[in-house]
Regions:
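Short acidic (Asp/Glu) and glycine-rich catalytic loops that position anionic groups and cofactors
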Residues: 2-3, 19-20, 81-85, 112-116, ...
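Acidic/histidine-enriched segments that form metal/cofactor-coordinating
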Residues: 2-105
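His/Glu-based metal-binding/catalytic segments typifying zinc-dependent metallopeptidases
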Residues: 7-12, 116, 120, 125, ...
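Intrinsically disordered or highly flexible coil/loop and linker segments, enriched in small
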Residues: 28-35, 50-58, 73-74, 110-117, ...
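Non-catalytic, conformational "gating/processing" segments within enzyme and secreted inhibitor domains
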Residues: 71, 100-135
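Short amphipathic beta-strand starts and helix->beta connectors
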Residues: 97-107, 207-215
Length: 224
């Protein structure tokens, strides 16, 4: 289930301050500060630019699985697709800042409301009592809102072969599918096969003989 999680931690004696701070952030954030908003977007993009090559293999695998798995397609929206979305936001921010601000306000008014709020507390009896006592600092100014109905996103399967150009010299190549869609089921034997393929075949032929940085395979219980 897709959720937005806002976390905070404090000493028991400071729970009131934490609740007040969370309340200010959720209920009174000023989205009209275009300079600060642009700074945050550029910081987010810079972080992705720096880490993109470090997790190239995972990005490629997520993109690959999104071709044939609806769940993976949804998860991939926060991966490489998100990076391209972020690039577009930064590149067009000056001319589209008012639209972006309106969208943020709309999303906040739907998410940060009492009717969609779930509170989880970790601690002992004293901590729970402190949270119960000061929770009003978080929710007093929160809109009532309306319960959000479940929205089903339709993701069509797409058989795509694609490549992405980067300034790095390391290539990440992936190939995969879902074996359950071909009539096979998951058993413990696949763990053995995974080890054999990874270390006896791929390691020797791709890593040792081919000179690549590494190669691996994996079989998930859902068939991916």
């Amino acid at each position: 289930v897709p959720v937005v999680v806002v976390r905070g931690k404090s000493l028991t004696t400071n729970v009131d301050k934490m609740m007040e701070l969370l309340g200010q952030i959720l209920n009174h954030t000023d989205y009209r500060d275009t300079n600060r908003l642009k700074e945050l977007l550029m910081e987010e993009k810079a972080a992705w630019d720096m880490s993109l090559f470090e997790r190239g293999h995972s990005l490629v695998m997520q993109r690959l699985m999104s071709y044939y798995s609806k769940v993976a397609k949804f998860k991939e929206q926060g991966s490489l697709s998100y990076y391209y979305f972020l690039n577009e936001l930064v590149a067009t921010f000056d001319e589209n800042s008012s639209i972006i601000i309106d969208k943020l306000k709309q999303v906040a008014s739907k998410i940060f409301v009492k009717n969609n709020l779930t509170i989880q507390e970790v601690g002992g009896i004293e901590e729970r009592a402190a949270v119960s006592k000061h929770i009003h600092l978080l929710i007093d100014d929160m809109l009532e809102g309306v319960p959000c109905n479940s929205t089903y996103f339709v993701f069509e399967d797409s058989v795509v072969n694609e490549g992405f150009l980067s300034s790095g010299k390391v290539q990440y190549v992936a190939r995969g599918g879902n074996f359950r869609q071909h009539g096979f089921s998951y058993t413990g034997a696949l763990r053995v096969l995974e080890t054999i393929v990874r270390f006896d075949y791929l390691w020797k032929n791709v890593r040792v003989l081919g000179g690549a940085y590494g190669a691996f395979t994996q079989f998930a219980t859902n068939g991916d």
